Amino acid sequence: MAGQKIRIRLKAYDHEVIDKSARRIVETVTRTGAQVAGPVPLPTEKNVYCVIRSPHKYKDSREHFEMRTHKRLIDIIDPTPKTVDSLMRLDLPAGVDIEIKL
């Protein structure tokens, strides 16, 4: 796999969970002998939802809810077959979305 690069994007609502997952990925990759760039924190996506508090009237009384999506980027340079195998067996928490591009 010479000259290849694996790009991993992580998304989660909780920043502690995503940081812990990124740390585990970096530790696993460095143990197998590949080079790692990252984790790079990407901009946090913030969605704000405005909801009327009353079910019928009082339109002036509203409540705001927000949902933040934290993102991290990890690049693995010159991965070995052992690196790919260990990444496939890595067990990460349920709240983390992982996108892998070769």
UniProtKB/Swiss-Prot annotation:
Pfam family, one: Ribosomal_S10
Key words of the record: Ribonucleoprotein, Ribosomal protein
UniProt GO MF annotations: structural constituent of ribosome; tRNA binding
Signal peptide span: none
Lineage: superkingdom: Bacteria
PROSITE patterns for the chain: RIBOSOMAL_S10
GO cellular component: ribonucleoprotein complex; ribosome
Physiological role: Involved in the binding of tRNA to the ribosomes.
Assigned protein family: Belongs to the universal ribosomal protein uS10 family.
Name of the protein this chain belongs to: Small ribosomal subunit protein uS10
Taxonomic source organism: Thermobifida fusca (strain YX)
